[in-house]
Amino acid sequence: MKIKKKYCGHVIIVGKANVGKSTLLNNIIGKKISIVSRKKNTTQSNITGIKTEDNYQSIYIDTPGVVFDKNNNQMKHHKNNFYQTTQIATLIIFIIDRIDWTIHDEIILNEIKKTKIPILIIINKIDKISNKIILLPFINFLKKKIDFIEILPISAKKISNLILLKNIIKSYLPENCHIYPECYVTTNSDFFTVSEIIREQLILFLGDELPSIIKVEIESFKKKEKIALYIKAIIWVKNVRQKSIVIGHNGEKIKKISMISRNNIEKKFYIKTHLVLWVKDKN
């Protein structure tokens, strides 16, 4: 019996904040493993997604959106770590927002070019481009920048060109043993998953009222056999003012955040959940 060759590699997803990296990752994996919102820098840590199809295993790393200093357009290294993640990369997916090429895209491209790793550029949100004729001149403009392995216009939200994208990625995976079992879709811990579910609701309910640096700490996570899940979490904010914003008038806002978070946790883990949230300030 002939043994099938196996292929496996790491694919790093990079780009400015809010260009659709997490949406793309979720659609490639086929499950929501990274929270999504219109707020910039929703993703605060590397999110790993795993897609195994037959003898191919792609390990995707969704990096936080690259942040720039407003004064000098320099990358803020302490908030972005794709320099480290590219060390293990087989392929880099560089996502840009429609045909909006900025100095920040240029800076990111110059950095990832230094890695000598193959780069696939994705022009995302093409569903928002009414006149598609302008795409071709823009693609020609990009081709002059570097010899990309492919320039692919897509709509991550509407999953256009997803099969083509997956096939391109597979063609660059090296022959390797699979690192994770076939059933794995992420390396995120249960603690991390729960904290992200809560943080997503905070972002949705609070919008721009609070900075994206808000932190959710899981204080306890206990499962009573297969009957129920008991979770206590602390929402850390900067000061008393922010604390009152999160809690809301008569506690209405935090009640809604808690209720929807609990429902989403139950859907994720298929178990009845008891969730207690505390809001604390660091002062």
Curated annotation (Swiss-Prot):
NCBIfam families referenced in this protein's UniProt entry, alphabetically: era, PRK00089.1, small_GTP
Region (G3): 62-65
Any one annotated GO CC term: cytosol
Region (G4): 124-127
Sites where the protein binds GTP: 15-22, 62-66, 124-127
Record domain KH type-2: where: 198-283
Biological process terms in GO annotation: ribosomal small subunit assembly
Keywords, in A-Z order: Cell membrane, Cytoplasm, GTP-binding, Membrane, Nucleotide-binding, Ribosome biogenesis, RNA-binding, rRNA-binding
UniProt key word Hydrolase: no
Region (G2): 41-45
The protein's assembly and partners: Monomer.
Annotated region described as G5, given as residue ranges: 154-156
Similarity annotation: Belongs to the TRAFAC class TrmE-Era-EngA-EngB-Septin-like GTPase superfamily. Era GTPase family.
HAMAP family per the UniProt record, alphabetical: GTPase_Era
Record's subcellular location: Cytoplasm; Cell membrane
Residue intervals of the Era-type G domain: 7-175
Protein name per its UniProtKB record: GTPase Era
Gene source species: Buchnera aphidicola subsp. Acyrthosiphon pisum (strain Tuc7)
Role this protein plays: An essential GTPase that binds both GDP and GTP, with rapid nucleotide exchange. Plays a role in 16S rRNA processing and 30S ribosomal subunit biogenesis and possibly also in cell cycle regulation and energy metabolism.
